């Protein structure tokens, strides 16, 4: 009887149960399944079945397929101990030096055990096209698995090859182990690479009954056909009688049964190390496996994380240059060894890794972390590779050492004996014991190493970060984003308020200037506990600021305002907590039996809210009285409207509080009254925040600055300096400042017209609607807004610089050429040079250009200072406007020269540089808008700084061109 060898999957034919398959865009016929081997008779001799397993050969008796089928080529059949050969047209994938790569164009779901499943976009290695004579079916490898795929669903990537020879794959996942001729025990023949790896199987996986077919059990005389090694200490021979189960390939993975013959044929000791595919793919890529965590491996974060600080150029002469070292030091706040890793820093992470002083610098750490957390009793040397715990648990203890063969190329770096436990993978011995994973003790989560150096076995046993040595209030242990002063609730209890005691300076973290207001707190608490009406409140002894008295200093006022706002938020939060706890488990509102509410606690909490809101109102009233003396006439009306809203809220609180006070828990007090009081109190913190924000935004106008205002004559003389020139200048625009402009000296028409005209030209921060935008722009130009930024105040030098820039930028350009006298008499130029009129024009505007360049340089310096000190948008936007207006004067000079000069050369060059300056100004406007909208984005601010630096260089070129033209 003859036997037909079907290598891979033969052509689909209608014989012996094979069927034609028609399936969409694929090839017309589906290849014959490898599962025909289930029909093999057990009594057939095994000596004629030597077909390499790399191509998933299956053996089928010719009688089973029908007598009409032709026999295979003689060379495809191996007899006796003849060397295995492939059928004609089949070439082993491992014999190729390079394999072409292909990309999946469509999804593919495997419909037979020998077919690969893949998704659209997957990249796979094409081992052989039209494999085994199957037209349109390719033998491919994907994720360590081999199988056939429809070629019309792949696209060959031209010029792209697999960097290394085809990785030995598991072959067709459902192929049963191939019998081998009997050999003496201990003798191992080379095995094709594809048969040396089988997918690892989780213990939980159990094949379904319909997915399992059995391979006939060999008799005792046929045991040698399986080529199982003998009593080699590294391998276990399968028993004489055993049953191997195999499952169909699923769309994702194919898993064999967890039997003792988990691997089809264990590799022999003489097999090449590079052909052993028992290492996870990530372990063979070299020394870059676990150098640093992925979040730290990308040195520059590739744009996902901007630099921590903006690099500002330094001024050198009249230009600006970047310092190379400055950018390297300030751009990233990372340890130096992470910026320049060397060969000795292969696994160079911060000291929290627990590195010991005597450890090697060149150790690689090729083991995934889960390998060091193996089962109990395992020898650590066998944990070099990532063994899934589920597979290990399913194996007998005697097989632990025979599962994986360690390639010499990897194991040569592994120290022997106890050195592995101490130094190889930086894992303390304590980690060898199974422990539940604690994220807080993970080496990459720890923020800093413990202060003391613990023993080696306690590397990760970090003591608690905050031992309770002191009685710290819980509020101090839970810092939140909104806790400005972090008030412990247990220290703001209402009984202290009722007693009239003064809150100590430890409750609010107020700087020393605000501590002078402590007696005021006592008066506030004692006066507010009476629950009096509005008339009595105005006559109380609260002394925040009394109208008619000198306003508070700016710093003290800002600090007091923040303290008052925080007091309102804290007292309301306490009231809401008190009422909320009543509805909780065990509360007096949660039980069916009526209980008496804690009236005294509720009254004290309501009184505290009244007092906090009342004190904020008194502070706001004093600010309203100060608003009548500011340069902005609309400020008083706006602040009055904000104050009136807060007054209405306070009156509502007083009414509900009086109901609670008069009821005293009797018939006059109901739970509905309490609910209405709580509902009214919920909106109080937001109203107080709006009022405080408005006061803070105009604090520089409402309160006295730290720098005492100059004497009267100085202020008045600076105001009346060339008023006609200011009014007629093209650069005239309001820069209101409290010491200068008053209601008598600034006509309404001039202020409004010039402000609107400036808005038309430089409105580039569109954050609100038109009206809101114009109001914001006007505030940006006020010196008070600049003063109140930067955490309370700017330095005195910056304030003087801002005032000087106001005057310089507002100074108009001189157009009167008739009254101009050159510093040196005009010398006639060379023949064919400029005419006298053009030379005079160039010299005149060259002087104007140099004067304005000084102003521009000062404005750029101030702008860079604001950016370098991380000032908020309202500061650097105002400084950028000084830069823009100063540079715009140079554009005006160039435009005038291009229109009045007679020489074509002068007109062309001046026009070119004027257009260049205009383009740079547009770029500065756009980048400044982006930096303001994206604040505090360092990348956006850096782009803005770069544009201003380019503007400085271009203005210097413009001046040099004017000088060259004038000297021609």
From Swiss-Prot:
Motif SH3-binding, residue numbers: 733-741
Modification type N-acetylmethionine: residues: 1
Biased composition (Low complexity): 525-542
Region (Disordered) location: 164-277, 393-416, 503-544, 705-756
InterPro entries in alphabetical order: BCAR1_C, BCAR1_SH3, CAS_C, CAS_fam, Serine_rich_dom, Serine_rich_sf, SH3-like_dom_sf, SH3_domain
UniProt keywords, alphabetically: Acetylation, Cell adhesion, Cell junction, Cell projection, Cytoplasm, Phosphoprotein, SH3 domain, SH3-binding
Pfam families membership: CAS_C (PF12026), Serine_rich (PF08824), SH3_1 (PF00018)
Protein name as it appears in the record: Breast cancer anti-estrogen resistance protein 1
Source organism of the structure: Rattus norvegicus (Rat)
Name of the gene: Bcar1
């Amino acid at each position: 009887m003859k036997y037909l060898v079907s290598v891979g999957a033969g052509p689909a034919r209608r014989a012996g149960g094979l069927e034609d398959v028609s399936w969409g865009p694929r090839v017309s016929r589906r290849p014959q399944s490898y599962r025909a081997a289930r029909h093999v008779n057990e009594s057939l001799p095994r000596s004629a079945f030597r077909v390499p397993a790399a191509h998933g050969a299956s053996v089928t008796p010719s009688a089973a397929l029908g007598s009409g089928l032709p026999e295979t080529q003689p060379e495809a059949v191996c007899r006796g101990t003849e060397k295995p050969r492939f059928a004609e047209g089949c070439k082993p994938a491992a014999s190729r030096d390079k394999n072409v790569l292909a990309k999946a164009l469509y999804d593919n779901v495997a419909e037979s055990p020998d077919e690969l499943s893949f998704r659209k976009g997957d990249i796979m290695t094409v081992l052989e096209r039209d494999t085994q004579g199957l037209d349109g079916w390719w033998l491919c490898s994907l994720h360590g698995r081999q199988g056939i795929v429809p070629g019309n669903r792949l696209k060959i990537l031209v010029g792209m090859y697999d960097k290394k020879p085809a990785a030995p794959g598991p072959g067709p996942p459902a192929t049963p182990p191939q019998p081998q001729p009997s050999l003496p025990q201990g003798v191992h023949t080379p095995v094709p690479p594809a048969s040396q790896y089988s997918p690892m199987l989780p213990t939980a996986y159990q094949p379904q009954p319909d997915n399992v077919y059995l391979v006939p059990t060999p008799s005792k005389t046929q045991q040698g056909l399986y080529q199982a090694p003998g009593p080699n200490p590294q391998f276990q021979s399968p028993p004489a009688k055993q049953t191997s189960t195999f499952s169909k390939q699923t769309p994702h993975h194919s898993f064999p049964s967890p039997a003792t013959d988990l691997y089809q044929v264990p590799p022999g000791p003489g097999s090449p190390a590079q052909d052993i595919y028992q290492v996870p793919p990530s372990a063979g890529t070299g020394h870059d496996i676990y150098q640093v965590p992925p979040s730290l491996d990308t040195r520059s974060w590739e744009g996902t994380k901007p630099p921590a600080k903006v690099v500002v150029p330094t001024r050198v002469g009249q230009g600006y240059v970047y310092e190379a070292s400055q950018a390297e030091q300030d751009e990233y706040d990372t340890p130096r060894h992470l910026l320049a890793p060397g060969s000795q820093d292969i696994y160079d992470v911060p000291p929290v890794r627990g590195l010991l002083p005597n450890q090697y610098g060149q150790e690689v750490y090729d083991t995934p972390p889960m390998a060091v957390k193996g089962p109990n009793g395992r020898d650590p040397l066998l944990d070099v590779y990532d063994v899934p715990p589920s597979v290990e648990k399913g194996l007998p203890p005697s097989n632990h050492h025979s599962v994986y063969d360690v390639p010499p190329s990897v194991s040569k770096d592994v120290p022997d004996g106890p050195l592995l436990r101490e130094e190889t993978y930086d894992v303390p011995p304590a980690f060898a014991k199974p422990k539940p994973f604690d994220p807080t003790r993970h080496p990459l989560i720890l923020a800093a190493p413990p202060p003391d150096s613990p023993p080696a076995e306690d590397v990760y046993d970090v003591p608690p970060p905050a031992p309770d040595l002191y009685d710290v209030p819980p509020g101090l242990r839970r810092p939140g984003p909104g806790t400005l002063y972090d008030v412990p609730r247990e220290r703001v209890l209402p009984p202290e308020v009722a007693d009239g005691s003064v809150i100590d300076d430890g409750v609010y973290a107020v700087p020393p200037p605000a501590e002078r207001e402590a007696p005021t707190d006592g008066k506030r608490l004692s006066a507010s506990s009476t629950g009096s009406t509005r008339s009595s409140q105005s006559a109380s002894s609260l002394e925040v600021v009394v109208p008619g008295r000198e306003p508070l200093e700016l710093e003290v006022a800002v600090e007091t305002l923040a303290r008052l706002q925080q007091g309102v938020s804290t007292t309301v939060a306490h009231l809401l907590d008190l009422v909320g706890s009543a509805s909780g488990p065990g509360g007096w509102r949660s039980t069916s039996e009526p209980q008496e509410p804690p009236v005294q606690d509720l009254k004290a909490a309501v009184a505290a809210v009244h007092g906090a809101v009342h004190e904020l109102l008194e502070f706001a009233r004093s600010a309203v009285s100060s608003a009548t003396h500011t340069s902005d006439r609309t400020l008083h009306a706006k602040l009055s409207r904000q104050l009136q809203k807060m007054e209405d809220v306070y009156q509502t609180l007083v009414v509900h509080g009086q109901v609670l006070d008069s009821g005293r828990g009797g018939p006059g007090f109901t739970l509905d009254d309490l609910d209405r009081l709580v509902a009214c109190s919920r909106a109080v913190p937001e109203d107080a925040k709006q009022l405080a924000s408005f006061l803070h935004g105009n604090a520089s106008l409402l309160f006295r600055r730290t720098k005492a205002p100059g004497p009267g004559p100085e202020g008045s003389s600076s105001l009346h300096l060339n008023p006609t020139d200011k009014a007629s200048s093209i650069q005239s625009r309001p820069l209101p400042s409290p010491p200068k402009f008053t209601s008598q000296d600034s006509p309404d028409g001039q202020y409004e017209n010039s402000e609107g005209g400036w808005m038309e030209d430089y409105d580039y921060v569109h954050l609100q609607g038109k009206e809101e935008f114009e109001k914001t722009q006007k505030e940006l130009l006020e010196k008070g807004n600049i003063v109140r930024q930067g955490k309370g105040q700017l330095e005195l030098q910056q304030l003087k610089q801002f005032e000087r820039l106001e005057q310089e930028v507002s100074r108009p350009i001189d157009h009167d050429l008739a009254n101009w006298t050159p510093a040196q008499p005009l010398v006639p130029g060379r023949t064919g040079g400029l005419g006298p009129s053009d030379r005079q024009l160039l010299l005149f505007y060259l002087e104007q250009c140099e004067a304005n360049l000084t102003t521009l340089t000062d404005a750029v310096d101030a702008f860079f200072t604001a950016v370098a000190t991380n000032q908020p948008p309202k500061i650097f936007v105002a400084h950028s406007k000084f830069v823009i207006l100063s540079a715009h004067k140079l554009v005006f000079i160039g435009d005038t020269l291009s229109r009045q000069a007679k020489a074509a050369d002068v007109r062309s060059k001046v026009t070119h540089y004027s257009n260049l300056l205009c383009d740079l100004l547009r770029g500065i406007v756009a980048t400044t808008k982006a930096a303001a909208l994206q604040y505090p984005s360092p990348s956006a601010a850096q782009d803005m700084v770069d544009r201003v630096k380019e503007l400085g260089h271009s203005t210097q070129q413009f001046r040099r061109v004017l000088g060259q033209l004038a000297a021609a």
